[in-house]
Regions:
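Catalytic Walker B motif of ABC-type/P-loop ATPase nucleotide-binding domains
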Residues: 159-163
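Helical segment within the ABC ATPase nucleotide-binding domain
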Residues: 173-185
Length: 242
């Protein structure tokens, strides 16, 4: 029996039952504890479909998805925090109000408990300088960091990040990467990215997707060896036919 926090077996997803095409087809995916698992693929490869299924946004057309032992959508959602490519935040609130609200809504009882959780999220995401600012006044980089802090306040075992570095400048991206590495000491992190170097530097394991299917998976070295290439970029090009 698989003991990984995230187990996806024989996953198929079709949005339109009248069409033959699947958004994802026969996908098997596993993400372990205290690790970073990356999804690589071009637009339309099926990455977002798989991530949203893992986060409990939709059922599989066929196959099974288990997150921390839960296979029903409510159970999955309780165990996953989803960080979208474009932050979805209440911009009328201050950062402080937003994070305390998220911590309280996530079942953290008592003001001391909420404070400890929020303090940790603020420290990891380096938000002290904007803690009292309104979300509406923040830059894209800070919005992404607040979105990540919000996911930390949910206290879930699994954090799913869809194209987290999109639109960030190199300095902001480097900071977010450090935060992800810190989180992975106690969490299961799953992320999608277009950037080969990002996956190579961050991920314990990578899955390369093309046309809704997994072309290859393993450590970076394993994927490179399997493809017969010299590096991950060459392996990606060969495996996806680009």
């Amino acid at each position: 029996m698989w003991t990984d926090p995230v187990v996806v077996e024989n996953f198929y997803k079709k949005y339109d039952p009248k069409k033959k095409e699947y958004a994802c087809e026969n996908v098997n995916f596993f993400a372990g504890s205290n690790s970073i698992t990356g999804l690589l693929g071009q637009n339309g490869a099926g990455k977002s479909t798989l991530l949203k299924a893992i986060a409990g946004f939709h059922y599989a057309t066929e196959g099974t998805i288990s997150v921390c032992g839960c296979t029903d959508l409510p159970g999955i959602r309780k165990n996953v925090a989803f960080v979208p490519e474009i932050p979805v935040l209440d911009r009328s609130l201050t950062v402080k109000e937003l994070l305390y609200l998220e911590a309280s809504l996530s079942g953290n009882e008592g003001s001391q408990s909420c404070r400890g959780i929020v303090d940790r999220a603020v420290e990891i995401c380096a938000l002290n300088e904007v803690f009292l600012e309104r979300v509406s006044k923040l830059s894209r980089g800070f919005l992404q960091r607040v979105s990540l802090a919000k996911s930390i306040c949910r206290k879930t075992q699994v954090i799913v990040m869809d194209e987290f570095s999109s639109g960030l400048d190199p300095v902001q991206n480097a900071l977010i990467r450090r935060q992800i590495v810190e989180l992975a000491k106690t969490k299961t992190i799953i992320l999608s990215t277009h950037h080969i170097e990002e996956a190579q530097n961050l991920c314990n394991k990578v899955y390369i997707m093309t046309k809704g299917m997994v072309a290859c998976n393993g450590t970076v070295d394993e994927v490179v060896s399997f493809s017969g290439c010299r590096n991950l970029e060459e392996a990606f090009i060969r495996l996806t036919g680009n």
